[in-house]
Amino acid sequence: MTTETRSLYSQLPAIDRLLRDSSFLSLRDTYGHTRVVELLRQMLDEAREVIRDSQTLPAWCENWAQEVDARLTKEAQSALRPVINLTGTVLHTNLGRALQAEAAVEAVAQAMRSPVTLEYDLDDAGRGHRDRALAQLLCRITGAEDACIVNNNAAAVLLMLAATASGKEVVVSRGELVEIGGAFRIPDVMRQAGCTLHEVGTTNRTHANDYRQAVNENTALLMKVHTSNYSIQGFTKAIDEAELVALGKELDIPVVTDLGSGSLVDLSQYGLPKEPMPQELIAAGVSLVSFSGDKLLGGPQAGIIVGKKEMIARLQSHPLKRALRADKMTLAALEATVRLYLHPEALSEKLPTLRLLTRSAEVIQIQAQRLQAPLAAHYGAEFAVQVMPCLSQIGSGSLPVDRLPSAALTFTPHDGRGSHLESLAARWRELPVPVIGRIYDGRLWLDLRCLEDEQRFLEMLLK
């Protein structure tokens, strides 16, 4: 060991001496003596490694208390941090999908603070069913006979198949063998549910006769899967649920549908593309319809199944139901969200998802122009800050082809270096409330469709 190396090691302080320093008193009060000591030991090991490898001291050795504070502050942050979503994707899976309505937030807080009648019947003091209140609401809205709630739509499809078709065949069009995020594939789910997939037709064309020819003594279900995250266009043919139900009645085989996103209102009345609604499929005679709670519905993550009473009863009594059931917080949020649909005239005001989806391009453009001047003044030395038209997307596999006209603030580096964009995006991710945009075509884009707290946004970006 060289004299220089010994000198560097000798500059490392003892933990006891550091702890006696007044700057560590508040750290010990905030984070606890044990955690502070653990971190100091770790930092001493790091410092020794740096000395050994590069014959120098880490820069933070000049102020140990400041480094400890920075590390413990970051460590104490929740893994689920609020962010400002300016990606242009409203229902962003990585950012938690639907924002919850205030009614849902209040319902969850109440359910967390006190015991609730989750499975308790106040009328007779007996045991109730956790799905009952929501089932009644969903039946009122969709016209179904009964309903079942699980923790997401993937679970809903798994339960639906396992409870009604295990050991038997399920007939599905080849054009509907979807894969969603996380490698969730209909053929894989069928295997897990104990079903045999019987695919019919071709990728782009499936006829009623294809289903008819596939039916045999081992057929349990005819299944439709809404292709919510892709679109097949051109020379295509698919039969709708009403036609498939008619065939199912003729052959005495139930029809079930995985609707995916699911919307309880006709979105076209808000200027959005129309999506099939559960109530339409129930009216057409479909036996079971499954859909998500946290996509177009605008509620918490949940899987909802509505349909015929005898079919729902089979789902409720299946062993998987207990493993997949929703907890009290999910049920509280979902019930509060579904209740908003009883008053559709106020829905776009009270449901954040619908409010964001229906923001007009003109309103967003005005907002962008209002923000452009102060941001250009602050960032203009390095970036050209412009207002540009863009197209938002709904996200989470909903309406994959359709885009929503919007407006964005774009930041283009004067020197054209992409590394400057990456650096700027990284700086914004370190803000108290991280701002998440997207880099595309040599610019950093901030699509303002989902920006509601304009003042907070400006305060952070102008610091």
From Swiss-Prot:
Kindly list the biological process annotations in GO that this record carries. conversion of seryl-tRNAsec to selenocys-tRNAsec; selenocysteine incorporation
Q: Name one GO cellular component term.
A: cytoplasm
Instruction: Please name the pathway.
Output: Aminoacyl-tRNA biosynthesis; selenocysteinyl-tRNA(Sec) biosynthesis; selenocysteinyl-tRNA(Sec) from L-seryl-tRNA(Sec) (bacterial route): step 1/1
The reply to whether Protein biosynthesis figures as a keyword in the UniProt entry is yes
Location in the cell: Cytoplasm
The record's catalysed reaction(s) read: L-seryl-tRNA(Sec) + selenophosphate + H(+) = L-selenocysteinyl-tRNA(Sec) + phosphate
Q: Which cofactor does it need?
A: pyridoxal 5'-phosphate
Question: InterPro entries given for it?
Answer: PyrdxlP-dep_Trfase, PyrdxlP-dep_Trfase_major, SelA-like, SelA_trans, SelA_trans_N_dom
Q: Which SUPFAM superfamilies does this one have?
A: PLP-dependent transferases
Oligomer status and interactors: Homodecamer; pentamer of dimers. Binds only one seryl-tRNA(Sec) per dimer.
This chain's protein is named: L-seryl-tRNA(Sec) selenium transferase
Q: Which organism is it from?
A: Escherichia coli O17:K52:H18 (strain UMN026 / ExPEC)
Q: What is the lineage of its organism?
A: Bacteria, Pseudomonadati, Pseudomonadota, Gammaproteobacteria, Enterobacterales
